[in-house]
Amino acid sequence: MSAKIILVFCAQALFVQSALSQCTSRATVAADRGIIGGYGLGAPYGLAYGLEAPLGLGYGLGAPCGLGGPAIDITPTIGGGLPVSSASAIAPVGLAVASENVYEGILAAAGELPFVGTVGVEGVLPTAGAGAVHHSCGNGINAMASRDAAFAPGYAGAYGIGLGAYGLGVPALEVPALGYRAGWRGCGCGL
């Protein structure tokens, strides 16, 4: 009788684990335990993929999660930036940015929200001013855009001189002769 109870208990535990669990690799668990994990040199997936792969050392040194990522202290704006990053194996389910500040003068705000972003402008706008919200998804078409991690140091991307999303790398290399996003992990030239 006790053997049946133990067998049923173990079977229930197996069913609960299989129903409520997520399959992740051991690299995420190992990276979060050492000096190279989390927000260290190999964030978030360790050094297993090598120096040039987007999830290895290159990702840790050039992305917002790693050693040289842009931080509030070095952002070249007045009032600091709003860096939002996730080094988790689980995708974030939502991001909300709300502000009830009063802005006077010319205001230009640009950024990217993950997957689907909703922007709203409410309140009284002066008659001499204008307010506009431009929303796009992907590269101007209704699709998801896939971008690789930056391989330059993180501070270079903040000033527009790096290979990151704000520098020379992504828009300049999207030419048909070199393939889509020629460079690291592109579809053309075997790069």
UniProtKB/Swiss-Prot annotation:
Key word Protease present: no
UniProt GO cellular component terms: egg chorion
Annotated source species: Lymantria dispar (Gypsy moth)
Annotated protein name in UniProt: Chorion class B protein Ld34
One function term, GO molecular function aspect: structural constituent of egg chorion
UniProt keyword terms in alphabetical order: Repeat, Signal
Keyword flag Signal: yes
InterPro entries documented for this protein: Chorion (IPR002635)
